[in-house]
């Protein structure tokens, strides 16, 4: 039975929904002012795994991931680039989709952009004003009245104090608001901007929404019954963003609830959270130029999703070598996947039972991955003397790997992709010719000539490996 750690209750809880129930999932998306970095990649790969596993168990999922396409960061970046917000945002969204496609992420069922929901946001603010949870400040901003929401802090067990920064307030002078931590719902502007992506008309004059009300309004619009089964995001969003979301949503609809709050750990680089603010971010594009997307996924899954991941090239290379070794075990195996094999069937197998036990324990992917490694070792062990068993094990490895989005390439194609990454065309042609020449000499049992070519390939940075069935090569 699946158990998931709920941030709200601080414990693992049984996920006991009926299989025919649609599971509503909302994950906070990207603010589109710059390239996506691997902190984003980790968060969305984690929720990709969660959704894949729920679907494997037989659940129907309805997955929403929003796009923040209006924000101070976007406005400032557009000014720096001397381009319109519209051009900047659309360019970043296009690159984001390209990155996510390369990472083989499941597409959300809905991907609402904030600017497409301005009317809904205005309606939400009207309701908060009506319910006495918001007010118009002296500078005409609309702010949330924090003192009136008595349950504030029940998700994170944290409260604001004067030393903390609520980063949706926009003035350094706080004397125009009731509480120093009241956050902005609507940012007033003196006039409509020429760039209509910046300001919109409202009953309170021209302006634009604050960050927290954007997610809350989108959730309120899509989940009419006021229930979200899984709400997720990075742990950095727990406070104040998700705390503020709850305050707004419950102030609009007192019956609003989230069944499971799931938060992923941060990616740490150079002793800080990976962030453009700290100038320590590594873009997804950079990583994809060096590593296959499945290697990146494997790297993330080797650390439990709730734990921080300390990024280093050294660890990434180590994970790459482990992953390549597993893929290599699939070479020359005949994989047959019976898609009709059900969940109960797998539970009867000891190794696979351990895999599902790990996944049912709060998506324990490090343990699940170690079991995949064990299957790979058994394939190697049986390849020579028990081909039948090796093929069954290889089929199991691919079957279980698919649940995690892994081992979906033909092994030979995988090694071609990995080998060819960032290599010049001329070098690849030379290597291919030498490799085929060596295979020819091996077939003729001309071992001396075969060894000479192996040494030449090594000088080109290529290692050739042989087994009892075939040969293959990889770049060092």
From Swiss-Prot:
One of its GO terms (biological process) is cysteinyl-tRNA aminoacylation. GO terms for molecular function: ATP binding; cysteine-tRNA ligase activity; zinc ion binding. The keyword Transcription does not apply. It comes from the Bacteria. Keywords: Aminoacyl-tRNA synthetase, ATP-binding, Cytoplasm, Ligase, Metal-binding, Nucleotide-binding, Protein biosynthesis, Zinc. Zn(2+) binds at residues 28, 215, 241, 245. Belongs to the class-I aminoacyl-tRNA synthetase family. Its cofactor is Zn(2+). A motif ('KMSKS' region) lies at residues 273-277. Its EC number is 6.1.1.16. GO terms for cellular component: cytosol. A motif ('HIGH' region) lies at residues 30-40. Signal peptide: none annotated. It is found in: Cytoplasm. This is Cysteine--tRNA ligase. PANTHER family: CYSTEINE--TRNA LIGASE, CYTOPLASMIC (PTHR10890:SF3), CYSTEINYL-TRNA SYNTHETASE (PTHR10890). Monomer. It catalyses: tRNA(Cys) + L-cysteine + ATP = L-cysteinyl-tRNA(Cys) + AMP + diphosphate. The keyword Nucleotide-binding applies.
């Amino acid at each position: 039975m699946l158990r998931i750690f709920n941030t709200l209750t601080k414990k693992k809880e049984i996920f006991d929904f009926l299989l025919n129930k649609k599971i509503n999932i909302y994950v906070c998306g990207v603010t589109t002012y710059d390239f996506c970095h691997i902190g984003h990649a980790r968060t969305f790969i984690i929720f990709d795994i969660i959704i894949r596993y729920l679907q494997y168990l037989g659940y129907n999922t309805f997955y929403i991931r929003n796009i923040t396409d209006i924000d101070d960061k976007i406005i400032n970046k557009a000014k720096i680039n001397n381009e319109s917000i519209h051009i900047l945002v659309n360019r970043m969204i296009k690159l984001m989709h390209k990155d996510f496609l390369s990472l083989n992420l499941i597409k959300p069922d809905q991907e609402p952009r904030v600017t497409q929901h301005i009317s809904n946001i205005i309606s939400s603010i009207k309701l908060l004003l009506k319910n006495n949870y918001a007010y118009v400040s002296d500078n005409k901003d609309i702010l949330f009245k924090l003192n009136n929401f008595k349950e504030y802090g029940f998700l994170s067990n944290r409260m604001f104090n004067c030393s903390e920064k609520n980063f949706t307030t926009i003035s350094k002078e706080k004397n125009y608001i009731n509480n120093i931590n009241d956050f902005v719902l609507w940012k007033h502007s003196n006039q409509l901007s020429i760039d209509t992506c910046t300001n919109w008309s409202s009953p309170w004059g021209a302006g634009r929404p604050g960050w927290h009300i954007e997610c809350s309004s989108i959730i309120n619009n899509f989940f009419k019954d006021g229930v979200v089964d899984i709400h997720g995001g990075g742990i950095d969003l727990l406070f104040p963003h998700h705390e503020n979301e709850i305050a707004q949503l419950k102030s609009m609809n007192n019956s609003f609830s989230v069944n499971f709050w799931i938060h992923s750990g941060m990616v740490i680089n150079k002793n800080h959270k990976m962030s453009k603010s700290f100038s320590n971010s590594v873009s997804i594009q950079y990583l994809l130029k060096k590593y296959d997307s499945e290697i990146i996924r494997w790297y993330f899954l080797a650390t439990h999703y709730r734990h921080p991941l300390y990024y280093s090239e050294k660890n990434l290379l180590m994970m790459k070598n482990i992953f390549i070794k597993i893929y290599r075990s699939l070479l020359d195996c005949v994989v047959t996947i019976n898609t009709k094999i059900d969940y109960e069937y797998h539970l009867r197998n000891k190794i696979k039972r351990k895999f599902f036990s790990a996944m049912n324990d709060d998506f324990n992917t490090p343990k699940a991955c170690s079991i995949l490694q064990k299957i790979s070792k058994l394939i190697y062990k049986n390849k020579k003397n028990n081909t039948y068993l090796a093929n069954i094990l290889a089929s199991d490895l691919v079957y279980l790997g698919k649940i995690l989005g892994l081992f979906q390439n033909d092994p030979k194609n995988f090694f071609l992709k990995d080998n060819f990454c960032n290599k010049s065309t001329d070098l690849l042609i030379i290597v291919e010719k030498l490799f085929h020449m060596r295979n020819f000499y091996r077939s003729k049992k001309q071992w001396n000539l075969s060894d000479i070519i192996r040494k030449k390939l090594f000088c080109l940075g290529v290692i050739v490996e042989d087994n009892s069935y075939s040969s293959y090569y990889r770049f060092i």
